[in-house]
Structure formats: C-alpha cells, structure tokens
Amino acid sequence: MNSKTLVSDLRTQRVLPIFRQNSAEVKQILNQLRPFNIRVIELTTSIPRWQDLVEDLSHDYIVGVGTIKSESQIQQAKAAGAQFLVSFGFFDALIEEVDIPVIPGAMTANELLTIQRAGVRCAKIYPASVLGKKYISDLKVLMPEMELMVTGGIPSSKDEIDSWIASGAFCVGVGSSVTSLLQAASRRH
C-alpha cells in the first residue's frame, strides 16, 4: 500500500475507526461494523498485546497502528503487519519512514510545513475539536496539497462528519465515539 491508495481508501470510507479497547471488544465492534464496509481501521499502541491484534486483523482489514511514539513501536508495528502508521505528533524516524505510509500529527501550520518539507503529504490534525472547522479551512488555504485527517473529540454523527469534510478534511478519525458511529451507520442503512 502507498500513501495515495491509503488516502483514497480513507476518503471513500470518510471515517477512520480508532480502537483503544481490548481485543475482544475490538473484534465485537468490527463484527457490528461489517455491514457498513469499513475496511480501514486504526489500532492504538495502548491496547494490551496490540501487536497480536494487528497480526490477527491484517488479513481482513487495512490495519494502521496509532499513537506511535518511538522508533521501536514503528518496527514492532511493521513486524506485526501494520499497513500504515499514525501518531499525534511527529519525529524524525516517523516522517522518514519509507516502507509504509505514515500519518504524522500536527497542530500548527509550522508543524504541517515541517511534515510537508519532509515529503509527507498527509497529516492528522489533533485535537481538531479544540481547533475547529474554520482552522482546517484556513490550513487548506495555506497548503491545499496537504491531505488532512481530523481527530480528537469529534462526534461521529453524519452531519458532524459531513461538516468536517466540507471544511477540508479528507477523513474523520473517531475513537471514543465509535459506538455512536455504529448508531449513525445503522440509521443510514
């Protein structure tokens, strides 16, 4: 998988479920999401034995590992079969990763510029709910070529997701509101 394919898949999916629950809960929620064609998911390094879960789910899903904070986590994620990496920030080993796509985190235009100058064209804006939709629109004016995924405190209602995408985000990451995502998805079908 390359970055363009990942962005395309996430743009189509519109929402990236971010899991922090234990393995059994993650699998239960994924079973509930199956009818809604969720293909791309993020598992965070805070899940106990996350490497085993990545290995297990990477046969059925495009699995990213999130909350990456170190070079050793990058190596562990790749060894487990992760197809992309996500972080709430950025550091040299992450933005220099070439084997699989990365979505480093940023909060300011300067951080986005640093990420872009390193050759990365996709970033996670966190915490987006604090910064707001107008902020995303303003960032897109400055750097229209950057693909921005928003996460952090965003409700997963259809209207909320639509408005973040209209502001310039290509995808909305939902973590604690993943159960609301299920409810919103069930209302659409």
Residue ranges and their predicted role:
Residues R49, K69-I74, K78-S176:
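Conserved anion-binding
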